[in-house]
Amino acid sequence: MVKRGDKVRIKRKESYWYGDVGTVASVDKAGILYPVIVRFNTVNYNGLSGSAGGINTNNFAESELEVIS
């Protein structure tokens, strides 16, 4: 089970961050499909051209994460 602050590697192949390492920001206990919010140091491609905007968090299921030490 992952917990807040864990470093995790992303295993969801269709994710922009596949293979990258992020930090668990929170884990929702409400029984939703993707309860783990992971924060990354980089942003994705959603920013406008030439701007630093974009998203640096995403939700994942625990089965899509590998805890690293």
Swiss-Prot record:
Source species, domain of life = Bacteria
Q: Where in the cell is it found?
A: Cellular thylakoid membrane
Where is it mostly found?
membrane
Give the membrane topology: Peripheral membrane protein
One matching Pfam family, short form?
Answer: PSI_PsaE
Q: What Gene3D superfamilies is this protein classified in? A: 2.30.30.50
Family matches, as InterPro entries = Elect_transpt_acc-like_dom_sf (IPR008990), PSI_PsaE (IPR003375)
Keyword Membrane attributed: yes
Q: Which GO terms describe its biological process?
A: photosynthesis
Coiled coil region boundaries: none
Keyword annotations for this protein, in alphabetical order, are: Membrane, Photosynthesis, Photosystem I, Thylakoid
Q: Which GO terms describe its cellular component?
A: photosystem I reaction center; plasma membrane-derived thylakoid membrane
Q: Which HAMAP family match?
A: PSI_PsaE
Q: Which family does it belong to?
A: Belongs to the PsaE family.
Q: What does this protein do?
A: Stabilizes the interaction between PsaC and the PSI core, assists the docking of the ferredoxin to PSI and interacts with ferredoxin-NADP oxidoreductase.
What is the official name of this protein in its record?
Answer: Photosystem I reaction center subunit IV
| Naturally occurring in which organism (per UniProt) | Rippkaea orientalis (strain PCC 8801 / RF-1) (Cyanothece sp. (strain PCC 8801))
Q: What is the lineage of its organism?
A: Bacteria, Bacillati, Cyanobacteriota, Cyanophyceae, Oscillatoriophycideae
